[in-house]
A protein has these predicted regions:
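Extreme N-terminal segment that seeds HTH/winged-HTH DNA-binding domains in transcriptional regulators
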Residues: 1-57
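Gly/Thr-rich phosphate-binding beta-strand-loop-beta motif of the actin/hexokinase/Hsp70
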Residues: 93-130, 236-241
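Short glycine-rich, Thr/Ser-proximal phosphate-binding strand/loop in the N-terminal lobe
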Residues: 19, 25-26, 111-143, 185
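Short beta-strand(s) of the beta-wing in winged-helix/HTH DNA-binding folds
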Residues: 50, 79-80, 179
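Glycine-rich phosphate-binding loop and adjoining helix at the ATP-binding site
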Residues: 127-170, 176-234
Length: 241
């Protein structure tokens, strides 16, 4: 989970979160994303960023950046701040953009044989709250797993003071063979059932969009977003359990 990774990174992890989250290097699929998304993720990855730097980084016109960022500001996703990275200057303070962190919230969960863990994060990747529930057994039926996930979500919302309508989406990881594109758990050491469309069942239970994947795949993404993988082209994550 992202929370475990950030704690393991210690002060360096805190520094990374405060200076943005997300990959710092361009990914192969970047050019296929909508330009509005590229602009937003460029700002989020850098923590804060002047419009001219966004235009230069994405190789687009300043006018296009102004149009896109104005829309993102109107939607409550970005906000203007004084550009603290450029130091003092005469006249009007330089302006940068940063993510409006409280505009959206997401939940990440890890399901395991001993306990299930959940974290609530804002749009800037800051952890707002954490919650845990003990797993009733080493391997569970799908029905029991859905019940425990629902209980975990209730506990997280209670600790954070948020309600379900504040949450935009949920990402869930668990060990085993997971078809992330279809949301199907083919086999998992924490579940009795096989070939279960767990993503759709969880989405129906929670009433929210759900993304489901193998927990090590998600740990690798956490390293890409928060850890040493942010600024390098290739890396590997090895887990020993």
């Amino acid at each position: 989970m992202a929370s475990e990774l950030i704690r393991d990174l210690g002060s360096e992890g805190s520094k990374l979160v405060s200076s943005g989250c997300g990959p710092l290097l361009a990914l192969p699929q970047d050019d296929t994303r909508p330009l509005r998304q590229q602009v937003f993720e460029q700002v989020r990855a850098n923590g804060q960023m002047p419009r001219m730097d966004v235009a230069r980084k994405l190789n687009i016109s300043p006018g296009s950046v102004t149009t896109i960022t104005s829309d993102l500001i109107a939607r409550g996703l970005l906000q203007e701040v004084e550009d603290s990275q450029r130091g003092p200057s005469r006249g009007r303070p330089p302006i940068a953009l940063r993510v409006a962190p409280q505009s959206r919230f997401v939940v990440g969960m890890k399901l395991s044989d001993e306990r299930h863990t959940a974290v609530l994060l804002d749009l800037a990747g800051t952890i707002i709250a954490e919650a845990h529930v003990a797993s009733a057994s080493l391997r569970q039926s799908t029905e029991d797993m859905l019940t425990e996930v629902s209980s975990l979500m209730d506990r997280l919302l209670q600790k954070s003071g948020r309600v379900m309508s504040d949450i935009s989406a949920v990402g869930i990881g668990l060990p085993g063979l997971v078809d992330a594109s279809l949301g199907i758990v083919k086999w998992s050491p924490v579940m009795l059932d096989t070939d279960m469309p767990l993503r759709d069942l969880l989405s129906k239970t929670l009433g929210l969009p759900v993304s489901l994947d193998n927990d090590t795949n998600l740990l690798t993404l956490a390293e890409l977003w928060f850890g040493a993988g942010r600024g390098i082209s290739n890396f590997a994550v090895v887990t020993i359990e």
